[in-house]
């Protein structure tokens, strides 16, 4: 039985909310939602070790506004019903629960009074007079405040607790955040009646990373989180760093095996790591897809690379496709920026990458030298500084964009917009303060230090948050601010129009803007109001340059606030939305939406974009994903809603297919346990839809221009496959299936090859990917670039679509050379066919070594020609003279053998 409470209590700019409590009774195979969704942020759970249906939940509650859905909640029937057993007020929630499993009736809990403001990254009001420690002696039914002497005076912030074992629940540690950016660790030996400060290191108590975990066996050992992972073996008096790195890793959680304290799991910003020796050595967090990404960009190379900055793990440039079967560490490199960076490659030269990092820093990374230059408009960092005290103020994310239109100007912004036409060597300020700040305000006064919402804008807390240059017109730029304002310039900043939608309220963050690739007057904005305690989806579109806006978020689920909306560059009515609850698609310009989750994890999507027919998304803590080839979605967007309900089988027009080899590996493949990303298919992606109630055989045929069938695939049989000796674990073998023939949408990939040539003995390729493909060689010659026909036969209907095969742009071979290669491969196949036929007509010695030396046999000829055929399949180049000589020699041997 596993219980989960959702929603972070770590107080940070992008704190993630949850939707209550879940429980599994089958070790995580299935889950049941048990309510408390309005609590939003759950800090801890206690499950009675004597009865798995009894639990207590510590709910911090909504962090951006008052709510009664906070405090301690208890259930005695497995979550069917909940009773709030401790509540102080609508701004004070519960942060932690601690107990000794040997004394399950005695529980300790901490309450935390706090509230976040949308205009602040740091300096949030995280202290309150109602924060404190509470104790229950009846399994959480009733609670009393612990007011023992020695505790610090209020106001207090986040309090984290740990109960030592074998002390009758009397020894308790508390890390307590106090005023003046202070904090310390306290300990009681009498269940809370008396406390003493045992460690004055304020970094042990914080609103973001402060936590304590007691060793389940040793009563003197306690662990603490923070930038490093720390351990005390003297009751908290001193702590030593067990694990960390320069820059800090931010450790947030620790589980210790109660039966073997040497075995632990610790969770950090990057992921989770495991130790079996008490922290002497650890596993890697690079074996799990836990990257937390903010902004996306791609380059114009092939294969294109994806760029982003992740939380506490730096920047990423990673190939969207690998030449070696799967995307691995070989396909990744950093690009010199900061954590939570927005990284944008120069559209003219992908070796130059610009990064927008902490506190307004803009960097320029050169792949040729690996050097990073600070090219900020004002190279004085404002990181972690009060925004009303600095020259230029930035939000958590510094916006950065490069125009796709020559001369490819680069834009960034604080409260004003900057433009550079020379790669950041110089900048021009091209806007006034767009945040709405009142220049007459004295920002040093206390009314701005603790400004309420109605004065925050005037005080100068606002900043530009998103920039979108038009991909159609130089100088046409849209910007949005974190306090709910939208502006547009059509002349490079000489004049700005305030085009804010009338219904957009103050401090509604304009998270991302998408300037249309189809129309200069069209733009989409994603509006995030969850920092105003409004979790409803908000997004808008204008088709008249901001004169009017239409809200398009209504069809999205409640609670799925919108981070990004992008228009498909080929189908203007096709939209994609990234929300706090996943990805959605609209086929009618936002009038209606439906889920596009498919196999995605349920997590927030911070950014997405469409490139080369692929949909690329950046998630909040679950890596980068790609939906390869959105041709089916474009097809649906192009037809009327009534036409989407098909009555007969339908073949979707395929996108151009590139001649690619799925795996070029010639070395020992990476082992199955090596973490990798999935390579996109290599070949023609063929999508077809079968109507409801369909039954019957399905066939796909590939036809040449003369109508001859190149390849055929059906739902009843797999294509004949040569036999080869399996000398490795079956993990490496894929599981090919016949064409699907069930109702619904199906996808099949043709590898753009003719059928393999006949052989007497095939072999498995070393270019293998576990559980996906270990090809049997020879694999067949590639078809030439050009036009082909795909025919779908389903039931009594046949449908044909044209398929265009194009060349890998990296290949320099001419059409004449490719035709020469194919002709030679066909010659080799013809001689092989005659050799195999002859072998079937003769009695050849069972083992090659039984033949007399120097005597020609069909097998020896076939062996040489099979090796030649395999070599020819590996490259796009005309055959060499030695290869031609081998074919001639083996053909002569065959003639002599036939004559004999």
Predicted regions and their residues:
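Beta-propeller blade termini and top-face loops
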Residues: 1-674, 681-684, 718
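Surface-exposed coil/turn segments at beta-strand junctions on protein surfaces, enriched
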Residues: 154, 167, 518, 679, ...
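Beta-strand-rich binding/interaction modules
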Residues: 365, 686-687, 694-713, 787-791
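Low-complexity, Pro/Ser/Thr- and charge-rich linker/hinge segments at domain boundaries
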Residues: 633-663, 802-836
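Contiguous beta-strand segments within globular domains
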Residues: 664-699, 703-704, 743-749, 832
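Glycine-centered tight-turn motifs at strand-turn-strand junctions
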Residues: 709-781
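Short acidic/polar inter-strand loop motif in beta-rich domains
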Residues: 755-760, 793-801
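Mature extracytoplasmic or organellar-lumen-exposed domains after removal of signal/transit peptides
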Residues: 787, 794, 801-803, 836-900
């Amino acid at each position: 039985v596993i219980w989960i409470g959702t929603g972070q209590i770590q107080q940070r700019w992008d704190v993630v909310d949850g939707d209550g409590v879940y429980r599994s009774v089958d070790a995580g195979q299935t889950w049941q939602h048990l309510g408390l969704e309005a609590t939003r942020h759950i800090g801890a759970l206690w499950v009675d070790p004597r009865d798995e249906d009894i639990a207590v939940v510590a709910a911090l509650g909504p962090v951006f506004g008052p709510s009664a859905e906070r405090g301690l909640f208890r259930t005695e029937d497995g979550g069917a019903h909940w009773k709030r057993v401790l509540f102080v007020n609508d701004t004070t929630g519960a942060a932690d629960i601690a107990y000794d499993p040997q004394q399950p009736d005695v529980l300790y809990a901490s309450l935390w009074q706090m509230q976040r403001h949308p205009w602040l990254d740091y300096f949030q009001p995280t202290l309150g007079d109602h924060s404190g420690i509470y104790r229950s002696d009846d399994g959480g039914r009733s609670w009393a405040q612990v007011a023992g002497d020695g505790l610090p005076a209020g106001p207090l912030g986040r309090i984290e607790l740990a109960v030592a074992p074998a002390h009758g629940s009397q020894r308790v540690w508390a890390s307590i955040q106090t005023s003046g950016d202070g904090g310390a660790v306290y300990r009681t030996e009498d269940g809370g009646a008396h406390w003493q400060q045992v460690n004055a290191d304020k970094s042990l108590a914080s609103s973001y990373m402060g936590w304590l975990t007691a060793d389940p066996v040793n009563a003197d050992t306690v662990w603490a989180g923070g930038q490093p992972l720390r351990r005390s073996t003297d009751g908290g008096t001193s702590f030593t760093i067990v694990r960390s790195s320069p820059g800090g890793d931010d450790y947030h959680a620790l589980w210790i095996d109660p039966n073997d304290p040497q075995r632990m799991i610790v969770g950090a910003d990057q992921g989770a790591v495991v130790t079996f020796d008490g922290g002497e050595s650890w596993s890697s967090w690079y074996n799990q897809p836990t990257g937390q990404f903010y902004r996306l960009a791609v380059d114009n190379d092939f294969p294109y690379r994806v760029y982003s900055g992740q939380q506490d793990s730096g920047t990423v440039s990673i190939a969207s496709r690998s030449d070696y079967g799967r995307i691995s560490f070989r396909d990744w490199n950093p690009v010199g920026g900061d954590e939570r960076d927005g990284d944008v490659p120069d559209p003219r030269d992908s070796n130059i990458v610009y990064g927008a990092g902490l506190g307004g820093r803009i960097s320029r990374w050169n792949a040729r030298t690996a050097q990073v230059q600070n090219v900020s408009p004002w190279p004085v960092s404002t990181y972690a500084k009060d925004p009303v005290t600095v020259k230029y103020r930035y939000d958590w994310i510094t916006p950065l964009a490069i125009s796709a239109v020559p001369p490819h100007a680069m834009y960034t912004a604080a409260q004003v917009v900057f433009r550079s036409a020379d790669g950041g060597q110089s900048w021009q300020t091209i806007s006034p303060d767009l945040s709405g700040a009142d220049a007459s305000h004295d920002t040093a006064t206390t009314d701005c230090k603790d400004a309420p919402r109605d004065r925050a804008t005037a005080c100068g807390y606002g900043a530009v948050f998103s920039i979108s240059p038009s991909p159609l017109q130089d100088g046409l730029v849209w910007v949005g601010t974190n306090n709910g304002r939208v502006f547009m310039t059509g002349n490079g900043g000489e004049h700005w129009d305030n085009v804010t939608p009338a219904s957009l309220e103050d401090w509604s963050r304009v998270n991302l803007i998408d300037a249309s690739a189809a129309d200069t007057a069209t733009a989409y904005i994603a509006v995030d109001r969850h920092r105003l305690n409004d979790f409803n989806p908000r997004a808008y579109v204008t088709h008249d340059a901001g004169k009017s806006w239409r809200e398009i978020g209504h069809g999205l689920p409640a609670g799925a606030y919108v981070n990004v909306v992008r228009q498909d560059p080929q189908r203007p009515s096709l939209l994609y939305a990234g929300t706090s609850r996943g990805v959605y698609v609209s086929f009618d310009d936002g009038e209606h939406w439906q889920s596009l989750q498919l196999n995605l994890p349920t997590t927030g999507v911070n950014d997405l974009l469409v490139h080369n027919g692929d949909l690329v998304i950046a998630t909040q803590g679950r890596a980068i994903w790609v939906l390869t080839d959105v041709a089916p979605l474009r097809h649906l967007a192009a037809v009327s809603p009534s036409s989407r309900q098909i009555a007969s089988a339908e073949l979707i027009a395929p996108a151009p297919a590139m001649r690619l080899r799925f795996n070029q590996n010639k070395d020992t493949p990476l082992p199955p346990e090596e973490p990798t990303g999935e390579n996109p298919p290599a070949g023609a992606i063929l999508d077809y839809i079968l109507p409801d109630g369909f039954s019957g055989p399905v066939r796909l045929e590939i036809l040449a221009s003369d109508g001859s069938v190149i390849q055929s695939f059906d739902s009843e049989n797999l294509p004949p496959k040569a036999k080869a000796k399996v000398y490795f674990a079956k993990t490496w073998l894929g599981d090919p299936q016949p064409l699907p023939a069930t109702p619904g949408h199906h996808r099949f990939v043709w590898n753009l090859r003719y059928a393999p040539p006949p052989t007497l003995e095939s072999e498995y390729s070393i270019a293998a990917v576990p559980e996906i493909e270990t090809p049997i060689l020879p694999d067949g010659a590639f078809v030439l670039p050009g036009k082909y026909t795909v025919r779908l036969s389903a039931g009594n209907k046949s449908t044909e679509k044209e398929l265009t095969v194009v060349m890998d742009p990296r290949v320099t071979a001419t059409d004449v050379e490719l035709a020469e290669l194919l002709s030679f491969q066909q010659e080799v196949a013809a001689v092989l066919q005659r050799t195999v036929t002859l072998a079937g007509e003769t009695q050849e010695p069972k083992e090659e070594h039984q033949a007399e030396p120097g005597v020609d046999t069909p097998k020896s000829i076939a062996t040489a020609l099979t090796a030649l055929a395999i070599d020819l399949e590996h490259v796009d180049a005309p055959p060499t003279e030695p290869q031609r000589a081998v074919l001639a020699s083996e053909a002569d041997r065959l003639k002599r053998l036939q004559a004999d």
